[in-house]
Regions:
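Donor nucleotide-sugar binding/catalytic pocket of nucleotide-sugar-dependent glycosyltransferases
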Residues: 8-60
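Conserved donor-binding/catalytic core segment of Leloir-type glycosyltransferases
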Residues: 55, 61-98
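Nucleotide-activated donor-binding/catalytic signature segment of Leloir-type glycosyltransferases, i.e.
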Residues: 105-125
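Conserved acidic donor-binding segment of nucleotide-sugar-dependent glycosyltransferases
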Residues: 117, 173-174, 178-185, 193-200
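Short alpha-helical donor nucleotide-sugar binding micro-motif in glycosyltransferases
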Residues: 129-134, 223
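Acidic donor-binding loop of glycosyltransferase active sites
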Residues: 132-144, 157
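Short hydrophobic beta-strand element within catalytic cores of glycosyltransferases
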Residues: 158-162, 171
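A charged, aromatic-enriched C-terminal amphipathic alpha-helix characteristic of glycosyltransferases
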Residues: 183, 201-248
Length: 250
């Protein structure tokens, strides 16, 4: 908004200083993807361990796929839902959009007759049903990790994702979906056409199995292992400091 545009430029330098000071006080960094680990290395000059977030695995029985594409998430500018709307409007493909946000009116204005907006009031069960029935899931945004592509894969649904950010670590091209190279409606449209032309017989079971790499059980195990290891490192550091202090006294 206009107030943010007026105030923020003068505060950015102070915020960068605060951010650097805060980062220097961090003992250990955990990144939610290798994409973010690289950014931590670039901006903070620090190494980090990668532990992927978790996703509830959709264990519902598989159903017949229907002839529509799906996108789920908040309707904000950086999600780039506009690319999915434009691509499917251009191709005359049915697209179901689940979510709400400030971009709703803008998206509806550019949408053709094949675009359906379901809003953000659906139950979890209803959303899972759309995940199960969708032909493919469209993910045009660039995100740190991106949980919705994993949710789609847990339903056995392939994902067509922009080939940057966390989606490059969760979507396997040719096995659980495709990447498209440019963050444009034309590039996404070309990816949709390729997906339909190739006619790859995706295995719902294999796609869901891949999503288990991001399960709640895996996350809990890795966090516990990480904390145990770091606690041992910390205790060893205390022991080393204690020995050093004794030697200094002698």
């Amino acid at each position: 908004n206009w107030l943010a545009r007026l105030v923020m430029p003068g505060q950015m330098h102070k915020m960068r200083i605060w951010d650097k000071c805060a980062a220097d006080r961090v003992d250990y960094f955990i990144a939610n993807s290798h994409y973010i680990a690289q950014r931590i290395k670039k901006y903070y000059r620090r190494d980090s361990d990668v532990i992927y977030p978790c996703c509830h695995i959709n264990e519902s029985p598989f159903v017949e796929k229907e002839d529509f594409y799906l996108t789920v998430g908040r309707l904000t500018w950086y999600k780039r839902v506009d690319l999915a709307v434009q691509a499917c409007t251009k191709l005359g493909k049915r697209l179901v959009v689940i979510g709400s946000g400030g971009e709703m009116d803008k998206l509806k204005a550019m949408a053709g007759p094949t675009i359906e907006f379901k809003g953000g009031g659906l139950t979890d069960e209803e959303v899972r049903g759309y995940y199960l029935r969708a032909k493919a899931f469209l993910f045009p945004g660039e995100e740190d990790f991106g949980i919705t592509p994993v949710e789609a894969q847990s339903a056995g649904t392939p994902v067509l994702a922009y080939g940057r950010g966390g989606a490059c670590e969760t979507v396997l091209p040719g096995k659980t979906g495709y990447w498209f190279e440019e963050q444009t409606a034309d590039s996404l449209a070309a990816c949709i056409q390729r997906f339909e032309k190739d006619g790859v017989a995706y295995s719902k079971e294999e796609i869901r199995e891949h999503s288990r790499a991001f399960s709640e059980e895996r996350f809990e195990r890795e966090i516990k292992e990480y904390c145990t290891r770091r606690m041992a490192d910390w205790q060893q550091e205390l022991l080393d400091c204690s020995h050093w202090e004794k030697e200094e006294q002698i």
